[in-house]
Regions:
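Helix-loop-strand module that forms the ligand-binding subsite of alpha/beta enzymes
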Residues: 1-40, 112-113
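Glycine-rich phosphate/pyrophosphate-binding loop and the adjoining helix
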Residues: 34-126
Length: 126
């Protein structure tokens, strides 16, 4: 998952869209995704696209087009840069896996991390 990019688009009636997008972004961050873009839209009356007022539809469309242009401009032949927060989370989980592996060498996650070399010098973003 390291080096991947994600776009989160939420749309809801009333409140809750931003917190939902934040929860999804938090989960993606723990999975190793550093480049996460979020767009959240609140609707107060209708969820049917044809019944949404033109002003709101134009606002939503322009924000999504702007985001699409930014994502299109990215050079996808190179992986996304792994952020410092994601690296810190990786090292915290690495310490946890090392401790659990000392207590129980047959622990499945420990064996997986050891097989990939992540408990040694190998890093998944390199």
């Amino acid at each position: 998952m390291f080096g991947k990019r994600a776009v989160i688009i939420t749309q809801c009636l009333g409140a809750g869209g931003k917190s939902t997008a934040k929860d999804i972004a938090d989960s993606l961050s723990w999975w190793g995704v550093s480049c996460i873009k979020r767009r959240s839209f609140k609707l107060m009356s209708e969820i049917d696209w044809n019944k949404i007022p033109d002003k709101k539809r134009n606002e939503m469309t322009s924000k999504l087009i702007s985001l699409a242009r930014k994502m299109k401009a990215i050079d996808y032949s190179r992986p996304a840069n792994t952020g410092i927060i994601v690296k810190m989370k990786f090292f915290a989980v690495r310490m946890l896996q090392t401790g659990l592996g000392k207590d129980n060498p047959e622990y499945t996650d420990f064996k997986y991390w050891k097989a990939n070399g992540w408990l040694d010098k190998t890093r998944p973003w390199k």
